[in-house]
Amino acid sequence: KERIITGSGSGSGSGSGSGTGTGSGKDAGYTPTMQRALPWILAILAGLVLALAMPGPGIWPLVVVFPVLLLEALDRTRTWWHAWLLGWLAGTVHWLAATSWVYDVMHHYGGLAAPAASAVLLGMALYLGIIWALIAGVVFLVPSVWRIWFFPVAWVAIDTLRRFQPYQFPWNDLAATVAHQPVALASLPVWGATGLGWALVAVGAGLWGWLRRDRRHVSAVQLIAAIGLTISMSALSPGFESAGAPVRVALLQPGTTLEEKWNPGEFEEIADRVWSLTRRAADAGAKVVLWPESAVPFRIDTDETYRRIVTELAIDLDIQIILNSIGGSSGNAFANSAYLVTTEGISPVRYDKVHLVPFGEYVPPWAEMVTTGALVREVGRFTPGQSATLLPSIVPLGESICYEVVYPGHSAAAVKNGAEILITLTNDGWYGHSWAPDQHFAQVRLRAAESRRWFARAALTGISGFVDPYGRVPERLEVGGQGFLIADLTPIRTVTPRARWGDWWFVLCAIGAVGLLIWTRVRPVSPLKEA
């Protein structure tokens, strides 16, 4: 498959305001058993509908339904502990559904028996569900009427913590649900995916309030604010300034399965496939060719034959090759690295992956007992890179390897360092035909729109593709496909507010959440009267 594309550039309960009550009006007709069960049912549905809104199922309008369900569940409980458990249940259900592919990774490729793989998935879901529990517990501390405004900022302030230790798993942020809608991405250069995520939750919280007649005046303000701010941020978003002539870039997708990759008898055929695709891409006019992560089963830092073949290929075809290989680091450690090969040889500047994959490239100490050698090669010996080093290609390239494209700050750092085109090399072969490839690719669209950069993604088994500075995808190679794509990518020097100022909307939400929490706890009477 060969394609050439061209792109240009109240019941507030107790006097403290922390309870909610379950007014008899809205529970009329429910038996006591139903009244007790309903919050749990609503919590389960909240987690499930958000999973269905994510890429894969892609029923994106459900993203504004989950706040309605979760807030209603919290409004029907009387104790903080109950609210905390409801949030934990909702979060656990969400991650069980949204990342169900973890079972296949652990069972099929990790060598774990089915019960053990199921236990890993459940443990992961319970662990990530704690974030939802924290959100629910904090939201419960606020009087019911204030939750319309408080829930969105609390969600952003707490859920964003998944980017940091001990989680380091910012997978499936809310903006990913609308990553396929370029109009929805128009505001990202200003407030990033964090801001758009807040707007989606704010709309959902506003809809919950609108369904309560006594709160429609509050919800109307919320809805107007969320929609108005999104439109305003879109209007304030900058265009982009070209930094030079377009660069013709090719993406290879060899389609090599992990079973082939781990079979020494297949090594020669795997390499020949990559050489052939590279030559065909060069014949089509490519000047820079991107190989995906783990494209060939050799190490460029220790295998002299491999180094010679790749260098000769670059010289003979008059191209530059960006490839992935394990690279030696200090001591006996290793880095997951990206190398630039030119007609002058292998560049001394390499990029070492900064954000390593939990259970893939390192194992948290508490989880070492469930890790197998088949899943984690040289586990514990990978060391993270220290910065978003640019590859000095025809234009400066900002690199992400596989999983770390889910970190907004990483691409932003590359842009601030001078990257004019962003690239990512990945091996999504672990995921098969699950929801994961779509979830992963959605993050590339978000990063492209946030940074106003062309983003090129080469994936071993798919999805490969080019994403333009507005988050649109001219064309892509699907999972299981084999071939290459070529596009003329415009280098861009514009630095967006999101890249320049960092995740400023997260900071505002954190301040707002703390401020609202204190305000509602110390003020004896809410300025907003509930009917």
What are these regions (language model features)?
Residues 5-29:
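Small-residue-biased low-complexity repeat regions
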Residues 5-6, 29-31, 163, 297, ...:
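Short amphipathic alpha-helical "recognition" segments used for binding
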Residues 28-35, 241-245:
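Extreme N-terminus of proteins, especially the signal/transit-peptide cleavage junction
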Residues 30, 34-236, 432-433, 444-447, ...:
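Membrane-embedded alpha-helical bundles of multi-pass enzymes
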Residues 237-501, 505:
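Soluble catalytic domains of enzymes that build or remodel membrane lipids, polysaccharides, and related
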